[in-house]
Amino acid sequence: MNAPVKPSKLIKGATGDWEVVIGLEVHAQVASNAKLFSGASTEFGGAPNAHVSLVDAAMPGMLPVINEECVAQAVRTGLGLNAQINLRSVFDRKNYFYPDLPQGYQISQYKSPVVGEGVVEVDLPDGEGISVGIERLHLEQDAGKLLHDQHPTSTFVDLNRSGVALMEIVSKPDIRSSEQAKAYVSKLRTILRYLGTCDGDMEKGSLRADVNVSVRKPGGPLGTRCEIKNVNSIRFIGQAIEYEARRQIGILEDGGAIVQETRLFDAGKGETRSMRSKEEAHDYRYFPDPDLLPLEFSQDYVDALKAKLPELPDAKKARFMAEFGLSLEDAGVLVAERESAEFYEAVLAALGNQPRDGKLAANWVINELFGRLNKEGRDIAASPVSAAQLATIVELIGEGTISGKIAKDLFEIVWCEGGDPRELVETRGMKQVTDLGAIEKVVDDIIQANPDKVAQAQAKPALMGWFVGQVMKSSGGKANPQSVNDLLKSKLGL
């Protein structure tokens, strides 16, 4: 799907270059109030076994009933991934034993998933982009959780998570580096958050990835892959891929063979370790669940959901660039999180959605607001400066009431103390000096006091900046910068 891997992206080994091939299975918890086949709550953080129905506990005679909202969320996600929506899909039993799986099988989808092939366009940190194919998206139940730290000799089972709806989003093996993998998961998480189908909170386990890694000589046949299970942070995904690729290359260069297996990533050591041999589909004895009819819906149902989808990040980025003249980089920063884009749009709305304000507003949102939020470790929901307040600061700059320097002082006051920016400018005497006579007097005084600097500036015009700085300093930053520049050019004969 993508161009051949650049030499700089290959991994150098003792016997030459190697290409890493990566596919990801991302498990995204569906944003819904109830579980996939029961009415039990999906609330995070409850006491162990507080949110367990008789269905979740697999009590005899209890039958699953599909949660329509989970189906709708899966369809919305498929539409957001530009994927084929299958109007008929089937739930299957995936048979295996584990203590946190009370049924003795997981209800999943095997041959007939609800969503088919799609594609995600991914922007990379180096400015390039790749297309990552989506193989499928299917719905399945999550398992419970084993608690090993509650008793010295026993393991307890918490079934709060048992039966929670997951979307397993399976990519094609189109990814060729750890950086690409991290960028793909970041983009996927952004899309899910825009859609409102998953909160993407990796710390709570709402989004986790199984990472399939193999290596080969560039352009050669695919190698034997190993699967790294349940990696729960984007940074760890990158580290796991880097380690696993090096491990496999080392084995192959020593004349060994890669064993297909499931591995775990040890975040403390930054390495993967063997967990078990890798199962194939036939090991799970898939068959259609006899308790559930095939899932069928109409194209009208799909169209109704599609009509209500929000504007997604790629479309929003393109609109920001077209309507407000933003650079690709600035537009990308603003749409990376839905809340960031909404804040920027709220600033623009307060300014009347004028295209002329787009760049200045973006500059203040990205550099001043985001910069300060990052410095203090806050997210945008906790910003002390509201969109309306920031819009007023931008408006004051645009109309020439305050200079950029004064605006930064004003932003600091609003951040620390709050208040209406326009009133603060009035009460604290922060208005920009636009009286040419007053500015000219300051300019004349500085020129007369520095005849040596005048000669230097006339010989080297770039030194006029020194005079600009002195005038701004003398005026307390209130002099209109354009007026200062015009007067100095005239009086210095530049």
Swiss-Prot record:
Protein biosynthesis keyword on record: yes
One GO term (biological process): translation
Reaction equation(s) it catalyzes: L-glutamyl-tRNA(Gln) + L-glutamine + ATP + H2O = L-glutaminyl-tRNA(Gln) + L-glutamate + ADP + phosphate + H(+); L-aspartyl-tRNA(Asn) + L-glutamine + ATP + H2O = L-asparaginyl-tRNA(Asn) + L-glutamate + ADP + phosphate + 2 H(+)
Keywords: ATP-binding, Ligase, Nucleotide-binding, Protein biosynthesis
Enzyme Commission number(s) from the entry: 6.3.5.-
Keyword ATP-binding: yes
Function: Allows the formation of correctly charged Asn-tRNA(Asn) or Gln-tRNA(Gln) through the transamidation of misacylated Asp-tRNA(Asn) or Glu-tRNA(Gln) in organisms which lack either or both of asparaginyl-tRNA or glutaminyl-tRNA synthetases. The reaction takes place in the presence of glutamine and ATP through an activated phospho-Asp-tRNA(Asn) or phospho-Glu-tRNA(Gln).
Record note on quaternary structure: Heterotrimer of A, B and C subunits.
Annotated protein name in UniProt: Aspartyl/glutamyl-tRNA(Asn/Gln) amidotransferase subunit B
Recorded name of the encoding gene: gatB
